[in-house]
Amino acid sequence: MLKRLRSTHPMLYCLVAEVLFLGMLFVASLLSLLLILFVVRDIDAVDDYMLTFMQETAGVLVAWLFLARTGKGGLLRRRGSGFFNGLLVGLYPIALISYNAYNTLLFGRPEGDMLPAWHVVWFLIGMTSVGVAEEFLFRGVIAQTLLEHFGTSRAGVWKACLLSGLYFGAAHLTNLTGSAPLGVLMQCVFAASLGTLLAAVYFRTGNIWVTVFIHAAMDITSMLIGGLYGTETVADSISTYDITMLTSIAVYLIPTAFLLRKKKLSEVELYFGRDMK
């Protein structure tokens, strides 16, 4: 049924995949809390990022099931350009991540000691699991489906990138339950632009683990002080976003245009031509 829906109504298929993914995250969050309350009986003793990992593991499972049931599980093993060559393609976001991490650690560290090592480990694991789950779904399931629908022409690749970015941005509306509305709206704009760039990197490399690495590194960097020192939560961080986040449209779409310049589109055909109908 999923394979037929994907073939005949690809955009509806993408919407169904996203809704089920987000729904599973919500259910997994509730079940994790109930399990912890039953076993530990003290929710304050449990690290928030441990809960994130448990939640995102359920998301990974949903995305993998969509890939497996539609015959696309092999995407997770596809080498494409290779991981390290792919990192060169994604050098721009990696440079941004490195700069932000350096700037944060140099100028943004609060007074006081870091959290215990086990908290930091859960922070790294939790944020990495977000990157894995979201890349499996938004690039492996959604961007891949849209590319196969629109084709590997220049217009087709751009449509797949932009539309998958919009799906990615819209998913962050779920943060309205815990963060300020303006912050969430700005996060959606930021995420839509970033999702467009990550789709371009995925299409240029044919290797989903490249975007998993970039996404996880970006999430870790964005919460670096909170994760190392416990000074803020993800919800607190989102609430601080303001209209300056609109600059992300240019920050991410200009390099997207560079990655998808005409002479490089043959690489998309090389890695994904076999998937076209």
Locate the predicted segments by residue.
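Alpha-helical transmembrane segments in multi-pass membrane proteins
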Residues: 15-69, 83-93, 117-122, 126, ...
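Functionally important transmembrane alpha-helices
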Residues: 184-241
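Aromatic-anchored segments of alpha-helical transmembrane domains
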Residues: 22-29, 94-102, 165-174, 216-227
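Membrane-interface starts of transmembrane alpha-helices
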Residues: 9, 42-58, 152-164, 207, ...
